[in-house]
Amino acid sequence: MIKKIMTTCFGLVFGLCVFAVGLLAIAILATYPKLPSLDSLQHYQPKMPLTVYSADGKIIGIYGEQRREFTKIGDFPEVLRNAVIAAEDKRFYQHWGVDVWGVARAVVGNIVSGSMQSGASTITQQVAKNFYLSSEKTFTRKFNEALLAYKIEQSLSKDKILELYFNQIYLGQRAYGFASAAQIYFNKDVRDLTLAEAAMLAGLPKAPSAYNPIVNPERAKLRQKYILNNMLEEKMITLQQRDQALNEELHYERFVQKIDQSALYVAEMVRQELYEKYGEDAYTQGLKVYTTVRTDHQKAATEALRKALRNFDRGSSYRGAESYIDLGRDEDAEEAVSQYLSGLYTVDKMVPAVVLDVTKKKNVVIQLPGGKRVTLDRRALGFAARAVDNEKMGEDRIRRGAVIRVRNNGGRWAVVQEPLLQGALVSLDAKTGAVRALVGGYDFHSKTFNRATQAMRQPGSTFKPFVYSAALSKGMTASTMINDAPISLPGKGPNGSVWTPKNSDGRYSGYITLRQALTASKNMVSIRILMSIGVGYAQQYIRRFGFKPSELPVSLSMALGTGETTPLRIAEAYSVFANGGYRVSSYVIDKIYDSEGRLRAQMQPLVAGQNAPQAIDPRNAYIMYKIMQDVVRVGTARGASALGRSDIAGKTGTTNDNKDAWFVGFNPDVVTAVYIGFDKPKSMGRAGYGGTIAVPVWVDYMRFALKGRPGKGMKMPDGVVAGNGEYYMKEHMVTDPGLMLDNGGAAPQPSRRVKEDDGGAAEGGRQEADDESRQDMQETPVLPSNTDSKRQQLDSLF
């Protein structure tokens, strides 16, 4: 009877086992073909950030959530490989993807506990989970994980699997992979890890937060001890090595990626361009982008601009705290302040600080980054003293929780503030358009708005050279006489009223030459020139310099620069004068490398005299250059002559009520544009002239940029002749002084003979017939805008 019962039980158990094996086999056969392809493992491309470099190899920007550095398995030290294997998978080199004995132990433990508490996942299974599966704790997921681990083991070598694991695993503090973790936790190369450090990092995969040695040092130490004991048990280390490692004092030095702060606007331009092309993939492919700017040029440009903005703001009243945070209880304040300040940047030696307390004597206690506390007395508060607990200033007053800026002046801290006035500087290689320096404002961190590329402002008189160039193309010369006298134009003002423009200084000189008029920036002369050549013709002609039609108002006010453009666009346009008449497009991306260091793309720029389109007659460019040299020598930009160079030319610009100030200066190699103005346009007062505030910025930067470069000037092109103390296109050379425009802007027929080889009298007559105006526009070829040309270049780059 008992034997029969035992036989029956055995049969049932055996049957159940067979049934279970059958079900397992069916499950395997049904699931295995549906497992994902291993292409992502066989062609592993880890998510690596976009890194932007200057031309001299300095990092100027890093973009991407995951901080990872791909490392070959052979470059990880043996001590780290052993530590990880001892911690995560002792039988890694023996099993086929799943550790059967480990699974058996886990199953027993899970049955006893009644839940999925232990997973016994091998390194291969963790690779399967990290790349393909979720983190949910279910038997289905574990089953798929085991099958996928087996598939991985059949396709990849053990070292390749380990390489994937070492580079992909998340280890806390935004570190992905052990190479990145070595930098972030210990600020050292992974190859330089000690045994103690390796064992500490090897404890992180199990639970990065729980075993973070910075946040939970005691738990992390216990985990390290467990791993070292495992290594000893597996004969990976000796007892002496274990004890030394346990007694080693570890120093955690948080790695901070050093990003050069001088070119943040340039780095952001690159980020935007690559994001537009690649989308979110731009931040994960590990691209390394080299730009055209050098950090030394960037620093010189940044300091030149900041100096002018600081000087203008000197003497201004204190505008108040820049922000406010709620500090809550005293015991929580220090931690809250430290966390808040860690997200702020020191700019121009202006250190962010948070007010902790205001004493009865109205001294102010502040906390600096790093936790240091400083008490500011009335002297240290300076111009900000009136803002201390001043209810009239409302939210801007200095009170507990206020965020202010301070500067250390020889050991004494004092309250300072960032200037409200803003500006931009753009410097280009005149022959290629390569950006040599670009600064889009005082502080990138406070406002990422790039005034060099995004601020659409009136260029004022810096636009006049384009009108004068159009006049030369119509037959006027630098010696043409124009009447600098007041003018009233019925129907040309707002709502059809009379337009009565004026010279900025209110003075008029009568008949003067075109050269004299541009040198002195005479508004009346510019208007009469435009009346003479026709607005339609001028607009079409000026588009050759890269301006869009929307930037060129179809009215006489165009002569005064009432359209809107950006500092970058105006610098590009002036490069036509500087390089002999060729249109080049600005660019900041020079080369792009992939994550493995292979050259992926390189800019092939348009080069003046080679493949760049001819925008204007080279003789026209030369004569305009010679005229604008006088602007620097004796005109509104004579402050630029402080460089002591004879090859400099340029033009200042100031808009109505001194709201915008400009200077664009150049020689045949470099074009630099400077713009100054408030983000919300308002008058800068008497100091807000281009020659007063913009020229000094240009001088400070160009003194550095042109250091060591000889001043050769522009070579005179064929077809230009000198006579009567002036330069002429050969066919427009006259024996007597220049033609004269009458008060209406029309040029009378010359009373003297033109040279025999002129081919006809100088053009310049007033365009009154519609047919003639249309003919003028047809004779003026229009090149693609600089935006179109730049897009074509970038498309070829990518």
UniProtKB/Swiss-Prot annotation:
<keyword id="KW-1133">Transmembrane helix</keyword>
<dbReference type="GO" id="GO:0071555">
    <property type="term" value="P:cell wall organization"/>
</dbReference>
<keyword id="KW-0472">Membrane</keyword>
<dbReference type="InterPro" id="IPR001264">
    <property type="entry name" value="Glyco_trans_51"/>
</dbReference>
<comment type="pathway">
    <text>Cell wall biogenesis; peptidoglycan biosynthesis.</text>
</comment>
<dbReference type="InterPro" id="IPR023346">
    <property type="entry name" value="Lysozyme-like_dom_sf"/>
</dbReference>
<dbReference type="GO" id="GO:0009252">
    <property type="term" value="P:peptidoglycan biosynthetic process"/>
</dbReference>
<keyword id="KW-0997">Cell inner membrane</keyword>
<dbReference type="InterPro" id="IPR001460">
    <property type="entry name" value="PCN-bd_Tpept"/>
</dbReference>
<feature type="region of interest" description="Disordered">
    <location>
        <begin position="739"/>
        <end position="798"/>
    </location>
</feature>
<dbReference type="GO" id="GO:0005886">
    <property type="term" value="C:plasma membrane"/>
</dbReference>
<feature type="topological domain" description="Periplasmic">
    <location>
        <begin position="31"/>
        <end position="798"/>
    </location>
</feature>
<feature type="region of interest" description="Transglycosylase">
    <location>
        <begin position="50"/>
        <end position="218"/>
    </location>
</feature>
<dbReference type="GO" id="GO:0008955">
    <property type="term" value="F:peptidoglycan glycosyltransferase activity"/>
</dbReference>
<dbReference type="GO" id="GO:0046677">
    <property type="term" value="P:response to antibiotic"/>
</dbReference>
<keyword id="KW-0812">Transmembrane</keyword>
<dbReference type="GO" id="GO:0030288">
    <property type="term" value="C:outer membrane-bounded periplasmic space"/>
</dbReference>
<feature type="transmembrane region" description="Helical; Signal-anchor for type II membrane protein">
    <location>
        <begin position="10"/>
        <end position="30"/>
    </location>
</feature>
<keyword id="KW-0328">Glycosyltransferase</keyword>
<comment type="function">
    <text>Cell wall formation. Synthesis of cross-linked peptidoglycan from the lipid intermediates. The enzyme has a penicillin-insensitive transglycosylase N-terminal domain (formation of linear glycan strands) and a penicillin-sensitive transpeptidase C-terminal domain (cross-linking of the peptide subunits).</text>
</comment>
<dbReference type="InterPro" id="IPR031376">
    <property type="entry name" value="PCB_OB"/>
</dbReference>
<dbReference type="Pfam" id="PF00912">
    <property type="entry name" value="Transgly"/>
</dbReference>
<dbReference type="GO" id="GO:0008360">
    <property type="term" value="P:regulation of cell shape"/>
</dbReference>
<keyword id="KW-0735">Signal-anchor</keyword>
<dbReference type="InterPro" id="IPR012338">
    <property type="entry name" value="Beta-lactam/transpept-like"/>
</dbReference>
<keyword id="KW-0808">Transferase</keyword>
<keyword id="KW-0573">Peptidoglycan synthesis</keyword>
<keyword id="KW-0961">Cell wall biogenesis/degradation</keyword>
<feature type="region of interest" description="Transpeptidase">
    <location>
        <begin position="378"/>
        <end position="700"/>
    </location>
</feature>
<keyword id="KW-1003">Cell membrane</keyword>
<dbReference type="InterPro" id="IPR036950">
    <property type="entry name" value="PBP_transglycosylase"/>
</dbReference>
<comment type="similarity">
    <text>In the C-terminal section; belongs to the transpeptidase family.</text>
</comment>
<keyword id="KW-0511">Multifunctional enzyme</keyword>
<protein>
    <recommendedName>
        <fullName>Penicillin-binding protein 1A</fullName>
        <ecNumber>2.4.99.28</ecNumber>
        <ecNumber>3.4.16.4</ecNumber>
    </recommendedName>
</protein>
<dbReference type="GO" id="GO:0006508">
    <property type="term" value="P:proteolysis"/>
</dbReference>
<keyword id="KW-0046">Antibiotic resistance</keyword>
<keyword id="KW-0378">Hydrolase</keyword>
<feature type="active site" description="Acyl-ester intermediate; for transpeptidase activity">
    <location>
        <position position="461"/>
    </location>
</feature>
<dbReference type="Pfam" id="PF00905">
    <property type="entry name" value="Transpeptidase"/>
</dbReference>
<keyword id="KW-0645">Protease</keyword>
<feature type="compositionally biased region" description="Basic and acidic residues">
    <location>
        <begin position="765"/>
        <end position="777"/>
    </location>
</feature>
<dbReference type="Pfam" id="PF17092">
    <property type="entry name" value="PCB_OB"/>
</dbReference>
